[in-house]
Each structure stands twice: as structure tokens, then as C-alpha cells.
Amino acid sequence: FGLFSIDFASKKVKFFTFFGRAAGETKFSAKKKVTAKNIRNVASNGVIATAVFATLFITGGMIINQAWYYCFFCIGQLPALYLLFVNTFNSDRLYDCAIASEQNNFADVLAETLNLQREINDGKIPEESELIMRDNQPIALYFHYLFTLIKGEKDTALKIFDNVKIKDLTDEEYDLIFPEIVYSACVRGDGDKINTLKTAAENFFSLSPENIGALRAHYAFRKFCGDEKWSEILRSSYTKALESRPPFIRLAEENLTK
């Protein structure tokens, strides 16, 4: 839930997002090198803040006698305890406790991808690290996919997401990877997969996602479905949008669509 969403990378603000996929979301690009320790520290602070939040509501409900204030603190106790529980005792890689743990390498992968994104946005064409090359987490696979395209290995790249479970993707991962799965199915002529993904694809494209992969996947999807006119309009939008992308992205896209 959120009244607006902010994307610092593109300098865009979307108001009245409410319950949309990007509701209350804030996106930004790192301006300097990020380390796994930085990310684990932020996650640890999140656990501490959640614990403090829960303690305040529980303590307030115990010591305050005035009716209105008492109701306020009592109402807040349940969500406070819920947040404390899911944020502290959840083993999912995306929750603060799991990210803060050194047994989980998600912080390492996240730091690496943030640094790669910073270099890409600065107009550089970075080298693929060993971590990105061997890790099988979705966001690492996405960057491995881009690096594989940079090398000109299109056929190999199109198979990278074959074993990804769409239901396990986060919203951000879904926005990046789902259109690539659709595009791969279209160019490989996999009608069975397109039929399986068709409803989800229609819903996804109806939200007008702005990333370049989604534009490319959308025109390929419309062409596969036989709507040549719509496909050409979308392809024109894709070509125009590609002009403003960093060299790394342009090279990957050129190798994918040639």
C-alpha cells in the first residue's frame, strides 16, 4: 500500500499507486560501491527497529490508563507483533533476519548486482564476476543472462530462465524475468508455453511496464499471437526507448534481437 512510488534512477514519481504492484515502492541507484556488510547492517537495523516498534506498543498498552490512548496502543500491538515475527523468525531470503545472516549469501549477490547496475548506468561495460556466473538466485541469473548476451551467445541466453519458478520471484524479479521468459518462448516458437503464460502475460503487459525487456517481449508476444499491426507499433516504441539506454543494455539488446 502507498500513496506514491519513487524511482530515483529515472527521477519519476507516481502518485496514487495505492494497492498497485509498485505501491509505496522506492527505487534508487547506488552512487558509490555497496558491500554485503552495508546491506547486512541495514537489515540488522531493520530487525532492531521492528523490535523497538513492537516493544513501544506492548509497553504503552500495559502502562497507559487513558481509554483513547490505551485503544491506540492495543490496536497497534497485533501488527507490531506480526511484523516482529515475520521479520525476525522468517528464513525467506528477502526478510531482514535472513539477509543479516552471513549464512545467506543474498546480501553478497545484492551488493554485486547493485554495483554492476551502478557501472552500467555510468556507461561502462563491466566484466561478469565469478559470483554472478555461478549463483542461481533469480537476480544473479538475470545479470548472467545479460552478460551471456554481451558475449553474443544468444541461444545459450534464451535457455537461462528455463528452470526458474515464476511463483517464487519477487515483484522486482518478476518485472525483469517474466518478460524474458515470454520473449524466449515466442522466438523459440514454444506455443505450449505461450498458451500457459498467456493470461499472466496479458495482465502483465496491461500494466504498461516501462523496462526495455517488457517492451521487447510485448511486441514479440503480439507478433506471435498474429497481431502484426500492434506488434509494429510496440516495436517502434521499443526502438525509440532503446536509444536512451546505457551502452551495456543496447549491446545486449542488439545481440538478442539480431
Model regions: which residues?
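Small-residue-rich helix-interface/hinge motifs
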Residues: 1-32
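Catalytic Zn2+-binding segment of zinc metalloproteases
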Residues: 1-3, 89, 185
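Hydrophobic transmembrane alpha-helical segments that form the core helix bundle
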Residues: 31-119
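Generic helix N-cap/helix-start motif at coil->alpha-helix transitions
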Residues: 104-109, 135-143, 170-179, 208-216, ...
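Alpha-helical segment of the N-proximal tetratricopeptide repeat
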Residues: 105-160
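Alpha-helical repeat scaffolds
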Residues: 124-134, 154-168, 190-205, 227-241
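Charge-dense, extended regions
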Residues: 232, 236, 244-258
